[in-house]
Amino acid sequence: MIEVKNITKSFEGRTVLNDISAVFETGKTNLIIGRSGSGKTVLIKNIIGLMKPDSGEILYDGRDLTSMDKQELNMLRREMGMLFQGSALFDSMTVLENVMFPLNMFSKESYKDREKRAMFCLERVNLAEAEHLYPSEISGGMMKRAAIARAIALNPKYLFCDEPNSGLDPKTSLLI
C-alpha cells in the first residue's frame, strides 16, 4: 500500500501540490484525474521519488520514501515501473535495449534471460518486430508501447503510468 500524507510541493513560490493525501491499495487500479496543469505529473514524480515534497510523507508499506537514503530508494525502485508522459526512450538505444535497461540495472539474471524477458514484454505490446529499431525510426504510438514494455519489464509491484493512452489509437489503447 502507498500512503501519501499531507504532501506539499512548490516551485519558485507557486504551490503545485497543497496538502495532498491519498491511499493507493495494493492490487487495485488507482487513478489520478485532473485537468491539464493541475499537478498530476508532479504528484507522480513525488510518489516515485524523482522529486521530493517540501513537506509530508510518502509511505510504501509503512516505509517513508522521503527519508530514504539513495541505497534504500534504489531498492524500492526495483519494485516500480514508470511510464512517462512522453515515453522517455533513450535515442541511442534500440527498442530492445530500452526495454532491457531496467533489467540491466536491477536484475541479476543472465543476459540471455534478461533479453528473453524484454522480448516477452515487447510481444505483450505487439512490438517484437521493432526490437532492432531506434526510437527515431518508429511512430509515436510505437514509442509509447516500447515505453510500456520497459515499464513492465521488471514485473513491478507498483506501476505508475502518466497519460498511458496518449498517442495510441483506440484499438491499441484497449489492448494496453
Ranges and model annotations:
Residues 153-157:
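A short, proline-enriched helix->beta-strand linker immediately N-terminal to the Walker B motif
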Residues 63-64, 111-129:
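Conserved ABC ATPase "signature" region
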Residues 159-162:
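Catalytic Walker B motif of ABC-type/P-loop ATPase nucleotide-binding domains
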Residues 56-64:
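Conserved ABC transporter NBD signature motif
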Residues 170-172:
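Helix N-cap at the start of a conserved alpha-helix in ABC-type nucleotide-binding domains
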Residues 48:
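Helix-to-loop junction immediately C-terminal to a conserved catalytic motif
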Residues 134-138, 142:
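Conserved ABC ATPase signature
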